């Protein structure tokens, strides 16, 4: 048996009487910004696209023009990308798909690629795929959905993805990526101390006590520590200001919300079904989210600091999106 710390049977260190907890880093849950501009191209920003990395599985959210270049610049691996989520069928959110799919074909990809979108994307994209990619090395599978209500559209062992009905000039939705609760963490030193057999570990992780060969009951609380709280990431772009989203966004760890305009341009925001920075911040404040990331900036602003100042005056834990930015979901943004 391997060596372990000098603990008594209550899990305390005999030397200094301090409780010992097995150290376990939180699983990876990070957001990469590939683009944060809006419809009009600029030299400062790429169109909207993001990648969420959950335990080294990559989920792309929107795919504007040039997304595959930014994907490489962010040092992400194409082989780990199997799912793409499209919010709506405006070009600045999906024009990058054809190029990305073609590149994956040139690379000899064999794994299926799943694309989730409002109804209509397959009808638009499939003819171009048929024309430009006669010999596809892999399958592209479309999963289309209606945007009027909240739907569970994806689930695996780690996360669920639920739609957020938004209001734009065409059918549009956001997404909530939610971690599933994880079993308790094993305190390895206590497992060694009581010489717990390996076959008992799954039961213990799921809440069972351990009974020693002598009949002593070792409480689960001595053998485990609680797992980290599940984290949630919410993506809202493009949409006008929707105060009723507070209930669905309540307490999320990170909210990305479009902030195309400042409050002074609110009439233009209303006309184009977009949101101001102040409105995005008000939604974040009312929903009591941990942190707010704003993006989808209008090309009219050469300096987005005006958007940041406006948002922070309402919700201080706000940050501007920026190409190649990587954010840990669960961290709190503080003003510099």
Task: Label every model-predicted segment.
Residues 31, 62, 71, 88, ...:
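Divalent metal-coordination and catalytic microenvironments
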Residues 65-116, 144-146:
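Active-site metal-binding motif and surrounding structural segment of the metallo-beta-lactamase
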Residues 96-103, 302-310:
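Metal-dependent catalytic neighborhoods of phosphoester/phosphodiester hydrolases
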Residues 5-7, 21:
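Short hydrophobic targeting helices and cationic amphipathic motifs
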Residues 146-294, 303-314, 330-336:
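Metal-dependent phosphodiesterase/nuclease catalytic metal-binding core
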Residues 26-74, 110-112, 175-177, 225-236, ...:
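Conserved beta-strand hairpin/beta-sheet module of binuclear metal-dependent hydrolase folds
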Residues 61-64, 81-89, 118, 233-239, ...:
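Active-site neighborhood of phospho(di)ester-bond hydrolases with catalytic His/Asp-centered motifs
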